[in-house]
Regions:
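Bacterial N-terminal signal peptides that target proteins for export
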Residues: 1-9
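Bacterial N-terminal signal peptides
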Residues: 8-19
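Boundary at the C-terminal end of the N-terminal hydrophobic targeting segment
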Residues: 20-24
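Short acidic-hydrophobic surface loop/beta-edge motif
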Residues: 27-32, 255-259
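M16 family metallopeptidases and their MPP-like homologs
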Residues: 40, 45-71, 85-131, 146, ...
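A common structural junction motif
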Residues: 129-137, 230-238, 346-355, 446-449
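An aromatic/glycine/proline-enriched structural segment found at the starts
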Residues: 182, 187, 207, 211-274, ...
Length: 449
């Protein structure tokens, strides 16, 4: 009886902490251009944060043009109608505006932070609108950026963490675009032409698939004008905004790659969860217990605290439009790589088979909810949430839902979700810096799927 009462009290306290945390009010509408707009009005600071994102990430590359999506985004700020790259930098600097970007397998976008005062805001938005809607993709700049990118790709081929990441993506996703490197391959980047960038931009940077996020010191009427201004002259688009379905792994695989580094870099995982998956919140809490909670996680306790096999070990899910990777990673001395790998695998196997305890669950939920205010404590962080909510068609109540749904996750929810999504016997494993006598060149899981 006392155990049930304790659980009830813990649940009530979680719900109280949830209800006490205020979340921003999100306004949403469709601009005349067809773009979806998400806006939070906040006059605490004389600032405006604006972002425009498109379904134009590396997941929309093709194998023969890997790297195209990233180069297209990168060159938006390198020249637009009436402005070269120096003009863009100077005009933004003159009004104290900061330009940024967002790029992953699903999304590509541009963001800006500016003072909300009329003169500064107008100049910053003029530059941003021109970049988005009148890019030039100058030949000379493209040649220079390709040279820089190829040099970076060659350098990455020497670093064990880069080698491991690339091999892991291929092992988990095979020929699926999620297995491509966002920066591309040396041979594909070398062949990219200006016409490729222009065609990709025209197909993927359309107004009807654009998501505009606005946060800060402006009114609703001003937000409506800004959203239309940033998207009203975008190309028609027309390319699909859907990524191809991801296949589950059909068998386990292990790839050992020799490297002179003193430590082995170990990655293991599989396709995990999409943004829209009903198991998302259960997996989120469960992963906090497994390897996402730092020193309180099981992996850290078993691998570092009890045995000293690694300084750090982690696990995470990457929720995407299609299931992104579930990944466990660590570094350890070469002579203990096999021991560390076996321990990590056994810890995961026990986690999936035996599940989590009520004590672990309560602590994890409390830590997640206590940390929630830090997730929305700046305009920039809220802006990114607006972009995610819009891009993945999440409800406007997502920030409230996040807290409520986390608080309601049960032991049974976590255990069932992990059993559905993670099979410890069917994982892709990559060990870079494996002991030389064990290193081998092998096919990736993607080649045998």
């Amino acid at each position: 009886m006392y155990a049930k009462l304790s659980r009830l009290i813990a649940t009530i306290m979680l719900l109280v902490s949830v209800s006490a945390q205020a979340t921003p009010v999100i306004q949403q509408w469709q601009a005349p251009s067809g773009a979806q707009v998400y806006f939070v009005e906040n006059h605490d600071l004389p600032m405006l944060d604006a972002a425009v994102a498109f379904p134009a990430g590396s997941g929309f590359d093709t194998a023969d043009k890997s790297g195209l999506a990233g180069l297209t985004l990168g060159l938006l700020s390198q020249g637009a109608e009436g402005m070269n790259e120096d003009d863009i930098s100077r005009r933004l600097a003159d009004v104290g505006a900061q330009m940024g970007g967002n790029f992953d397998a699903d999304r590509a976008g541009v963001s800006i932070r500016t003072l909300s005062s009329k003169a500064e805001r107008e100049e910053a938005l003029t530059v941003m609108a021109r970049m988005l809607q009148r890019p030039l993709f100058p030949e000379a700049v493209l040649a220079r950026e390709k040279t820089r990118l190829i040099a970076a790709l060659k350098e990455a081929e020497t670093r064990p963490e880069s080698i491991a990441g690339k091999a892991f993506s291929k092992a988990v996703f095979g020929s699926h675009p999620y297995g491509f490197q966002g920066s591309g391959e040396i041979d594909t980047v070398e062949k990219l032409q200006r016409s490729d960038l222009d065609n990709f931009y025209t197909a993927h940077y359309g107004a009807k698939t654009a998501v505009v996020a606005l946060m800060g010191d402006i009114s609703r009427a001003e937000a409506e004008e800004i959203a239309q201004r940033l998207t009203g002259e975008l190309p028609p688009g027309g390319a699909s905004d859907q990524i191809a379905a991801v296949s589950k792994l059909s068998s386990a695989s292990t790839l050992r790659i020799a490297h002179p580094a003193t430590q082995s870099h170990i990655l293991l995982g599989a396709p995990g969860v999409s943004r829209a998956d009903a198991d998302y919140f259960s997996l989120y809490v469960g992963n906090y217990i497994l390897g996402g909670g730092g020193f309180v996680s099981r992996l850290m306790q078993e691998v570092r605290e009890k045995r000293g096999l690694a300084y750090s070990v982690y696990s995470y899910f990457i929720p995407m439009q299609q299931p992104g990777a579930f990944q466990i990673g660590l570094q350890t001395r070469k002579d203990q790589a096999d021991e560390a790998f076996k321990l990590v695998h056994k810890t995961l196997q026990d986690f999936v088979e035996k599940g989590v305890s009520e004590k672990e669950l309560t602590a994890a939920k409390q830590n997640i909810l206590n940390g929630f205010p830090l997730r929305i404590d700046s305009n920039k962080k809220i802006l990114e949430y607006l972009a995610v909510i819009g891009f993945y068609h999440l409800p406007l109540t997502y920030l409230d839902d996040f807290q409520t749904k986390i608080s309601k996750v049960t032991v049974a929810d976590v255990n069932a979700a992990f059993k559905r999504k993670i099979n410890p016997d069917v994982l892709a494993t990559v060990i870079v810096g494996s002991p030389e006598e064990k290193a081998q060149l092998a096919k990736t899981a993607g080649d045998s799927k």
